[in-house]
Amino acid sequence: MFSAGAESLLHQAREIQDEELKKFCSRICKLLQAEDLGPDTLDSLQRLFLIISATKYSRRLEKTCVDLLQATLGLPACPEQLQVLCAAILREMSPSDSLSLAWDHTQNSRQLSLVASVLLAQGDRNEEVRAVGQGVLRALESRQPEGPSLRHLLPVMAKVVVLSPGTLQEDQATLLSKRLVDWLRYASLQQGLPHSGGFFSTPRARQPGPVTEVDGAVATDFFTVLSSGHRFTDDQWLNVQAFSMLRAWLLHSGPEGPGTLDTDDRSEQEGSTLSVISATSSAGRLLPPRERLREVAFEYCQRLIEQSNRRALRKGDSDLQKACLVEAVLVLDVLCRQDPSFLYRSLSCLKALHGRVRGDPASVRVLLPLAHFFLSHGEAAAVDSEAVYQHLFTRIPVEQFHSPMLAFEFIQFCRDNLHLFSGHLSTLRLSFPNLFKFLAWNSPPLTSEFVALLPALVDAGTALEMLHALLDLPCLTAVLDLQLRSAPAASERPLWDTSLRAPSCLEAFRDPQFQGLFQYLLRPKASGATERLAPLHQLLQPMAGCARVAQCAQAVPTLLQAFFSAVTQVADGSLINQLALLLLGRSDSLYPAPGYAAGVHSVLSSQFLALCTLKPSLVVELARDLLEFLGSVNGLCSRASLVTSVVWAIGEYLSVTYDRRCTVEQINKFFEALEALLFEVTQCRPSAALPRCPPQVVTVLMTTLTKLASRSQDLIPRASLLLSKMRTLAHSPATSSTHSEEGAEAIRTRATELLTLLKMPSVAQFVLTPSTEVCSPRYHRDANTALPLALRTVSRLVEREAGLMPG
């Protein structure tokens, strides 16, 4: 969330029109052409970067301005801040045909890194990625003493390796592996020299001290990213940079492709998961560069795990410890996949690490890579995978649902490891109520992730309970908010809407009378039962205005679409019936968040039709329930889309064409129910409490009644009389208060068309209840048999008959 000032600046940047931007660019061009690039230039470039980065679409800059930005980026004496801004602006414009940066003419390593970042943002248009990679390698080979340091180039190299793994040749990969070994293992243990204090500084004050551990002890082992000091030397910075790119290098550096196992000199290990002999120290023999790098990477990760046991003196170091643990476990996982001998050597320390961090809420992010490691190597590692699953899915979502970063990483972990769940997929599926806590609290950023995950979560056994949970998701958001508000004060409370005051909701949350409903909503696993949460909807109505609840409500329609797309792949006939009944039953039992019901009803109406298409006999099998649903007009206008879909489905599928069990008695019952419903709809007058009924409801009701009459011809006189009344009613002035002029015209036209059809019952049945053959594409392509031809023929016959009648 941005502050009010930041939001205001972003809004202003987005509102700037192209003409204003053009004038501003002209001013920047004058500043960049001046000899002195002062504070005005810096301020203007900052504003330009904000303008072009604040919008989703690309802003077009004048070619003169782009050329000057590129020229400024290449100036040797240009201030670093200006060059960083020029590179950032050019990256925002990428990919662009107007960029023409020259990589070969850049000598300074800092400038090389900035130019490379722009070229890589361009994409691999003219093999820029390969050119950048080769340029970085030449700089690394030159061992240039001048310039800030080679450390500016390592992030570029890491990006090149990921974007184009085949860029490096074997000898180049070997060279960089050797350099990485040196940087990782042999960085200095002395701090960097301080800046000169001038004439009055003493030589003793300028002597560098040793680096320390995070707890203040003097470091006695090799330097790592967790070593502390006031100033770092260049080789220490290179150590940090090397570790940051280590995992990407191990995965992508081989010429044979990403993640390929290196089997050189390891034929004796083929077919073996663990090799005690290979796990012994390799110090006694000279290893090839790639294997030597793996050995050093393993030692580095082991040292990081040991350093993470130390009690950090500063909070920043404590956070760094956890971040380094995550990366160390990920690197160890790569090493064990590439060389199984590392698995035997890693297990003891990783099991100890898992036992230490599983009870520490502050280290919860470390559990995800640890769980991935144990699940990946579970059989060989002799780890109880079920225990790992249970702890992961039971405790973490309950305790950490309010952490946005962890929520994203947790759902990403579930998506990335679906292939590892295999026999434990039921554990994941049963844990969906806990996973939905992440979704309820972080719905905007997690919606797309859950849309991708839902197909794996949906199961025939829990589909109904999951649909209830999705419909109650905004209610869950409100309850999670209350849970945090009622918890004891914590040192780091998550953010909520402080402007919202809901004392009655807090009292209800603590009331033992409602504890059962609240506990059901907060359940950690699928219970196999469903609870009617309508009482909670009323109790929590004051929370409906909460911004987080509103955001969650906006995400539910998208999630419902994904759910139905998945459930229809696994649903049998019985489940389809239950889903249809659930749609009808929950249509008037939704949390009263603003605009929520309208969005949900739109999805439910389309999905009800999809279920009927999937199983046309649904209408006959659920005849009694559909009649009950249609028996009440209460809330019809608020559920107009769903009512329209139900009525249309009755007219389409209540026929012996789709189900031989359909009887004339059923058709008559539905006709009477729909006739009564149409009468009540047309008699209701809109008011503040009862909104205007859409004309689509009336036209679909008339069409369905006509369809039913064509299938039970005893009903034709009643249907004709009803349609005549509707046509007359549409002409009356009273209709103007109920429907707009366009709506009344639509009703009048539809009534006239249907009356015309009913004058020839056999043709009406042909048109309104076509056989399977008539529905085939031939009837819509062949001019001699097309349905429009049949309709035109009927119209002419009826007109001729009307002309012969005495006036």
UniProtKB/Swiss-Prot annotation:
Provenance organism: Homo sapiens (Human)
A biological process term (GO) from this entry: double-strand break repair via homologous recombination
Function: As part of AP-5, a probable fifth adaptor protein complex it may be involved in endosomal transport. According to PubMed:20613862 it is a putative helicase required for efficient homologous recombination DNA double-strand break repair.
Keywords on record: Cytoplasm, DNA damage, DNA repair, Hereditary spastic paraplegia, Neurodegeneration, Nucleus, Protein transport, Transport
Annotated Gene Ontology cellular component terms: AP-5 adaptor complex; AP-type membrane coat adaptor complex; cytoplasm; late endosome; lysosome; nuclear speck; nucleoplasm; nucleus
Gene3D superfamilies per record: Leucine-rich Repeat Variant
Chief location of this protein within or outside the cell: cytoplasm
Disease link: Spastic paraplegia 48, autosomal recessive: A form of spastic paraplegia, a neurodegenerative disorder characterized by a slow, gradual, progressive weakness and spasticity of the lower limbs. Rate of progression and the severity of symptoms are quite variable. Initial symptoms may include difficulty with balance, weakness and stiffness in the legs, muscle spasms, and dragging the toes when walking. In some forms of the disorder, bladder symptoms (such as incontinence) may appear, or the weakness and stiffness may spread to other parts of the body.
Compartments where found: Cytoplasm; Nucleus
Subunit structure as annotated in this protein's UniProt entry: Probably part of the adaptor protein complex 5 (AP-5) a tetramer composed of AP5B1, AP5M1, AP5S1 and AP5Z1. Interacts with ZFYVE26 and SPG11.
Matches recorded under InterPro entries: AP5Z1 (IPR028222), AP5Z1_ARM (IPR055450), ARM-like (IPR011989), TPR_AP5Z1_C (IPR056856), TPR_AP5Z1_N (IPR056857)
Protein known as: AP-5 complex subunit zeta-1
Pfam families: SPG48 (PF14764), TPR_AP5Z1 (PF25153), TPR_AP5Z1_C (PF25154)
